[in-house]
Amino acid sequence: MDVRICLLLFLISNPSSCIQETYNEESCSTVTRGYKSVLRTGWYTNVFNLEIGNVENITCNDGPSLIDTELVLTKNALRELKTVSADQVAKESRLSSPRRRRFVLGAIALGVATAAAVTAGVALAKTIRLEGEVKAIKNALRNTNEAVSTLGNGVRVLATAVNDLKEFISKKLTPAINQNKCNIADIKMAISFGQNNRRFLNVVRQFSDSAGITSAVSLDLMTDDELVRAINRMPTSSGQISLMLNNRAMVRRKGFGILIGVYDGTVVYMVQLPIFGVIETPCWRVVAAPLCRKEKGNYACILREDQGWYCTNAGSTAYYPNKDDCEVRDDYVFCDTAAGINVALEVEQCNYNISTSKYPCKVSTGRHPVSMVALTPLGGLVSCYESVSCSIGSNKVGIIKQLGKGCTHIPNNEADTITIDNTVYQLSKVVGEQRTIKGAPVVNNFNPILFPEDQFNVALDQVFESIDRSQDLIDKSNDLLGADAKSKAGIAIAIVVLVILGIFFLLAVIYYCSRVRKTKPKHDYPATTGHSSMAYVS
């Protein structure tokens, strides 16, 4: 049945592979395969000159009007952008100070690429900000709206001039104000001013809100036509260009903008676009949930810590541990190579038999169970323990059944939702093949009483060694206690024997004395005859 589903998907959408999810009972984890990599290998720099013109010298002296309101907005935005630019320069000057890490992490908190990308982007922005570089870019755009300019450090950038607002102000708005003042009866002029001004105001707002570094590339920073032209100029293959053109939203999310500054009525900013240079290599995702064993009120719990995306690249395997390192579109996985960690090919052993793997599979340990749901591409893993209520359900009929304690894999073709207490998780509707690797949970090898306290990201064989050491200590303690008990028992027996011997000796003495008493002769006075002697001795 699963094979027929994959074949049907192939015929409908012509995918190069079918998504397959394998559940491993031994480790309470899933491995989902069938994805293809799209890996960022570089950055493409675009420098924009957003020209405003001499708007600061235009004034309205004939009372409130729509034109006057729009002029005030434009002037205030320009002043605000100059302030943001000055603050940005001050921050960049501190990049080499101990506060560097705080600045870079602040940029990442906004969702901007990686620390390395932000640092490199800021360094390039400092180069572009040099007076000679700004002039060179303006000269390259003197007779065209788009040109490739080479910076003094040899970096080639695509320069784009956006002069719609300047052209409108100089050729239409200024003559109209000079002729009729700001209170222009033609409402179309005010509407046109607002339309031409919208991009500038939105650019100011985005840089102001993000302290000079945007978290993505919006349509205001770079229109769709500008993005298409930039992608077509990227130094990569036609197949990769085609893939990026078909995933322009992803290119925007993975890019970012940096404010350069305001120069004589021109806002200069830089847009960094990712170049996705590696495609079609296999990728897979590992998801896990806590697995626990209970015995006599004690728990032994482990959780795989090698979760995340894995992609092969140039004969090696890159591991992307963080949730935001990769993003999925259909069966393509967009990842940033700078965020990847090269791991050994043997890491695959952890996906099949974690307890006998020679590779140091990383886990976390604990003695307190955690109930949770880990959503997978084709379903979900449920860890249900203690007094927590767990169930699966259907969007049509509600709860289907209650789940027992332990780890359970729920394929998305068996349920629509997973509920833990009052929290409901919606399963994906991605269609694919489901498999299960049978096996006894690895925690069955552990005695909860001997299980180590909470440990994070340790090799599983270290957990076994820790338990073995605990068992050895207990055995030695029992041996010592046994020897001590035997010693005490020997002493007690000796004392009892001595007491008994003492009693026997005492009884013997008493008996001897009594016998001697009975056999001793009596010494009485001699008996008299009753006669008295009358003799007289003189």
From Swiss-Prot:
Entry keyword set: Cleavage on pair of basic residues, Coiled coil, Disulfide bond, Fusion of virus membrane with host cell membrane, Fusion of virus membrane with host membrane, Glycoprotein, Host cell membrane, Host Golgi apparatus, Host membrane, Lipoprotein, Membrane, Palmitate, Signal, Transmembrane, Transmembrane helix, Viral envelope protein, Viral penetration into host cytoplasm, Virion, Virus entry into host cell
Lipid positions (S-palmitoyl cysteine): 513
The keyword Transferase belongs to this UniProt entry's keyword annotation: no
Coiled-coil zones: 125-153, 459-484
Disulfide pattern: 28-407, 60-182, 283-311, 292-301, 326-335, 350-361, 384-390
Topology feature Cytoplasmic, residues: 511-538
BP-aspect Gene Ontology terms: fusion of virus membrane with host plasma membrane; symbiont entry into host cell
Keyword Disulfide bond on entry: yes
Spans traversing the lipid bilayer: 490-510
Membrane-side (Extracellular) residue stretches: 19-489
GO terms for cellular component: host cell Golgi membrane; host cell plasma membrane; membrane; viral envelope; virion membrane
Marked site: Cleavage: 102-103
InterPro entries, per the entry: Fusion_F0_Paramyxovir
Glycan-modified residues: 57, 353
Signal peptide interval: 1-18
Matches recorded under Pfam families: Fusion_gly (PF00523)
Region (Fusion peptide), start-end ranges: 103-124, 103-127
Family: Belongs to the paramyxoviruses fusion glycoprotein family.
Stated name of the protein: Fusion glycoprotein F0
Lineage, opening ranks: Viruses, Riboviria, Orthornavirae, Negarnaviricota, Haploviricotina
